[in-house]
Every structure is written in structure tokens, then in C-alpha cells.
Amino acid sequence: MKWFFSNFKIITFLIKQVNNLNNCYIWLLFFAYSVLVSLFIQLIALPLIFPNLHIGNGLLDGGDWIVYQKYGVIMANVIIDNGWENWYLRPEGFGIVGVVSAIYAFFGIFEPYILVPFFSVLHALGALCILIITQSLGVSRSTAFFSCLPYLIFPSSLLWLSQILKDVFTLNASLIMLLGMVLFFGAIDKKSIKSQIISQSIAIFLILTSLFLIFISRPYMIELSSIFILIFEFILGIKLLTRIFQSNISLINFAFCIFAQILILFLAFNINSIEKHFAAYSINQNEYHVYISKSDKEIKKIFLERNLPMQIIEEKAGKIINKKELALEILKDIYKKPKSALRLIPSFNAESIKNYIPDLPTIEFETYESRKWQNSAFLPRVVDVQMSKVNDQRNYFYLHQYHANTTFDYDVEINSAIKFIRYLPRAVQVGYFAPFPTDWNSSKSNKANLMHKVIALEMIFIYLAFSGFIIALFIWRKKFEFWLLIAFSLFYSLFPVYAFPNIGALVRYRYAAIMIIVALSLSAISYLYSSKIKSNHSYE
């Protein structure tokens, strides 16, 4: 071991180089890596090395990215043929389709490789956020640099970096939000009013930018992020109170902090009004937009057999069906299982759906009824309502994904505050340690088996890295910023366990949250080792 640590000239050289790089150069380094590895996946790895996993256009066979690619091309053609007034940020409620179609239409290239630079910008920014956040705890720049690398280079991140997935927006947006919060914390300790105002203004800008990115991809997570902002405000309030008792903050600084907090809360909770504005361009509650293209032979056949109105325009446009009954009948034929149609009509409740589809299995409604939320008598109404929404999302997920290979805890109900709390230990276990070793070789398909092996290697690294968390807890237990990072990790790791009980979804949703713990753990181990080296030199 001594020989290993005494022969690290290359590592020492790299550390010196990192310490001399500013954030812009580090971001460029992260960006270059992201672009190169994504293009390698799309242009070389999939078509040449793993052709059995390749469906074309540099995309994996199977996944939401196929749908986003298809409709991105359709909407891009609509824009090119009819003008940019036909572009919407969230066509049919899918923000990622709006982004993809805009890029495709602007460049006139309908291949996913043109998206790589845009996705890489966000991924590199997310990694840089972790670097700055960990450095704010007082670790060296080189330590922070190496601690953020797992987020940048873990193979699972290639899924949303090289394919078309919403996670590239939400994961990096959440880290941008966290960076804004950390900067806000640091602004409190600034002596200059001007410096404080500048820092807090940047923090507010970052938080609002993150909310907008979340709005583009997953609008339902805006409210979730607003709840975490409340947690941030609570921790910040405690820090302000300690500064007041210590007489370590001026009245002007305190007043501006309160004003900034109120502004963030107001904007965060009113950004939903933007969502409502863009929803006007989405599917009307009484209309269903069904795209009919030449390749959709099955759908075209159904339309012809039922003598329904339709319009075929080369993969470019579609026809609006104005009656819910007709839409449901079509969906029944397109999907072999009637319950699949429910995925496209979330505004309906179970009983109204049953009226339109009489042959829908009754047992599913009985199960849904038994899982309905039971109001709590001891919690504030606002908290109870938010918990009920998570329970509804969980039920909705089970309704359509119960057959998925990695869905878990189907028989566990969390339909009351008591059950919600009792489930917490299990949620922590799954949120931070799943998939478990027993699940690493549970898949039979080649594609899933490859992904399981990749995730298994990542989990081994994560398990080892977690050993440093106890050290981190001891070193930074008195820092408010540290507890903000812990709150962030807990919040965004546990929420998907409650709302999306599927390992595949969990691995993606929790990625930023679990990488914060990994970064803290690695930073703590490095910090401890550096302290030991310094003490040995002092002793000599």
C-alpha cells in the first residue's frame, strides 16, 4: 500500500493541472467527453459492435426514445412545410418532442446525432455543478473534480446522453437548482451588500432556470421541486436564525435574504401558470390527436374499417378525433389489452372509463378503489394532499407497469400517512441500494442482461463509495450546506421509490441524488487521506 501511494507522479501531475483550470475549461473538458462518447455509441457501438441492439438512427431497440424520435420527425416536417408558427414548446404535452422537433427543423437533419451537443451541454453542466457544490464544503479543487467524475462517466448516464430521454433535462436541472441553493447559503456569509445581492441574484436565476428545464420535460415535477424549495427555505431559515443569535448578520443582509426567499417561493409556486398557458397548445380535454402516417398501416386499417375521418400526409401530420368514444374504440383495437388505453386518458377517473370500455377487467377497479388515499386527521391539509398525489401516481404506475420485469412492492399499499411513514425504511433501502445483488443476473434478454451487468458494476462502486459517508457525516456535520445536500439526496432518491416503483425508472430518477452522496463520500475519503499525509509530513 505504501508503494502504491508513493508512486503516484501521474496522479500528482493531473491534480496540479486540475487545480489550475477554471470552471470554463473544466466544463469544456466535460462537454468534449460527453460529445465523443455519445457519438461513439450512436455511430459505432450500436450499428457495428452491437447491431442486434440497434433499431436504426443510432437508437437502442426498445424505449421511449423511439416514440420521441418518430414524433420529433413528424413535428419537424410540419414546421418545415408550414412555418415556425406551427412549432410548440410542448406539442401534445411532450416538451422533449418540442425541443427535438425545433432542432431537427432548424438544421434540417432528422438524426439523433444532431441532438448530442445540446444534451452534452446539460450533462457537462450537471457534472460541473457537483464539482462546485462539493468544493463549497472546503475540499480542494482536485478532490471536487475527481468526486464529480462518477456522475459524468457512469455508463448508465449514456442512456439519456446518447438516446432521447427526459432525464437529461430533469437530472441536470435538479443539480442546477441545488447549486443555486448552495450559492444562496454562501451569500449569507458575505460582508458586502453588493456581493450578497449579486450572489443571491445568480442563485435565483439558477433556481428559475432549473424549474423551466423541468417544466419542459416533466411538468408534474414542478410541484415536487417546489416542495423541496420549501425544505431549502426551512434549512436556510435555521441558518439565518443562528446568524441573528450570533449577531453575525446585518439587518440589511437579513432583510434582503427574506425578500429573496419570498421571491423564490412566489415564482416557484406560480410557474404552474406557465404550464397552464402551454397546456392550451396541448391535447384538448375532449379531443385526441392521432397521427396517421404511411408507416402506420395497422392504424390506417382501423380507420378505414370504421369509416372514420383521417388525413394521411407522408409522416407529417395527423387528424383530430373529436369524440372520446371514437378515440377509446380505436385505442381498444390498437392495443390488445383495453387497460392500455388508460395511459392516454389520465383525466378520466375509473368509473367514467368503465362506461366507455365495459369489458375492462373489474378487478383492476376494485384494486384501485382499495388503494384510494385515506385522509389523515393529524397532518396539515396541504401535506396530506401532496402525499395523496404520490399515492395516486403509484397506483397509476402499477395500473400500467405491473407486468414490467423490475416493478417491486406491488402488494404494498401506502394509501395513508401512517403507511407512508412505515414504508420509509424500505424506501431508503431500495432508494440507495437497489438493484440488489440478487437482481444483477435476473434478466433473460440480451439487451436487459447487458444493462443489468452495467448497473451491477455501478452498484459495486456505489457500495464501496458509501463507506466514506460516515466520514463525511463526521467532517461536515456542522455545515448547513452539508445537510442541504443530504436533504436533496433523500428527497430525490425516495420520491421515485414511492411514486415509480420500478428499478429501471428508479435508476434514472435518482441518479443525481445518489451521485451527490457518492461525491460526498469520495470527497471525505480524499479529505481524510490528505489530512493523514499532512500530519505525517508535520511529524517528520
Name each model feature, range by range:
Residues 162-169:
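Short acidic/glycine- and proline-prone juxtamembrane loop motifs at membrane-interface regions
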Residues 158-159, 194-225, 230, 261:
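Membrane-interface alpha helices of multi-pass inner-membrane proteins
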Residues 113, 130-153:
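Transmembrane-helix signature of polytopic, membrane-embedded enzymes
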Residues 117-138, 464-467:
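Transmembrane-helix motifs of polytopic, lipid-linked glycan transferases
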Residues 2-10, 427, 431-436, 452-479:
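Hydrophobic, aromatic-rich transmembrane alpha-helices
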Residues 136, 190-202, 243-244, 445, ...:
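Membrane-interface helix-loop-helix junctions at transmembrane boundaries of multi-pass membrane enzymes
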Residues 1-49, 256-258, 538-540:
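Start-transfer (signal-anchor) and selected internal transmembrane alpha helices
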Residues 64-110:
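Short hydrophobic/aromatic helix or loop-helix immediately within or flanking a transmembrane segment
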